[in-house]
Amino acid sequence: IERSCPDWERLAQDGFVLLDPTGPGFDAAWSGAETILLSDIGDPLIAGRLTGAGVGPDQRLVFLQHGVTMRDMWRWFNGARLDVVVCATAAEQAGLTADHTSYTLTDREVWRTGFPRHDHLHSLLGRERDSILLAPTWDPEVSRALESDPDAVGLLSALYRPWLELAAGLTQASYRTVLFAHPKLVLHAPEWFRALGVPAVTGRELPETLARSWAVVSDRSSVLDEGMIAGCVGIVWDPRARPDTDRYRARHEAIGAIGADTSAQVHQAVEDVVAGRVTAPEDLLLLDAGACARLTALLRRDVI
């Protein structure tokens, strides 16, 4: 997390010992750990430790993902030391371990316990649904540009324009529409997001929003998967029609999501969902609030 963000201070007040990867004591903590849990294996301060001798043979490295992986990420995963990958759904596990995939992972290394944060999400289920959540995936190039030049907000305008147009159309049709704004982008341009005129949520408000949403519309974001396990209908729509979205769309259609090629098709899908003609697949719905307990039990074992 960003050292300057409120969560750093909050975690310190909660009793956690926090170490900056660039500060004193981190190397000793890393090398002395029996188990290392990571939520981001791409962090430039950490990524170099995941190859070569960065992790000892007697250590266990666990990738506690921050989102469901339904995109083809094998080039990234296969190049890093990953002893365990935590996942949330049967489709996700199959995509990581099946013989026809390019991943080197097997069912032995992939633990389908669910994510601990899903325990809170489960407690919110059953609320009245009244919203449509739009969740465009973040763009790392735009994020890097904003980080080096805060005035590069024109890139945000281009990225979000089709989504804001969709939001305007849905709002005009009397659907309450909410935009998911990726925290990394909001961090660099908070004023831009506040001035949108469309309700926007980031990570902290996301569980409540998902529990109240009929559907989640996304191009390639894992927020779509979060929504589907929370009982939302998934709608895959990529206004930029990128080729790698096809695989993402196909995998989600196979588990009950709706594919849309145009904004008009998104409107029709939303109408069908709100009218009850299309419902979320029940086999994806969170069954309990036991993910944290399941993961903790496995971590306490001496072997993978």
Q: What is the meaning of each model-derived region?
A:
Residues A28-A29, N78, E208-L210, R251:
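Structural alpha-helical scaffold elements that stabilize or flank donor/cofactor-binding regions
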Residues P116-W192, A260, A293:
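Conserved catalytic-core segment of nucleotide-activated headgroup transferases in glycan assembly
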Residues G32-T35, D83, D130, S213-A215, ...:
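Conserved acidic residues
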Residues L287-I304:
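C-terminal alpha-helical cap of glycosyltransferases
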Residues D107, E191-R194, S222-L286:
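Catalytic binding pocket for nucleotide-activated donors in carbohydrate/polymer assembly enzymes
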Residues I1-H120:
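Active-site and donor-binding regions of nucleotide-sugar-utilizing enzymes
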Residues P21-F26, P183-D225, I229:
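Donor nucleotide-activated moiety binding/catalytic core segment of transferases
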Residues G48-T69, D151-P162, G231-P243:
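A short, gly/pro- and small-residue-rich
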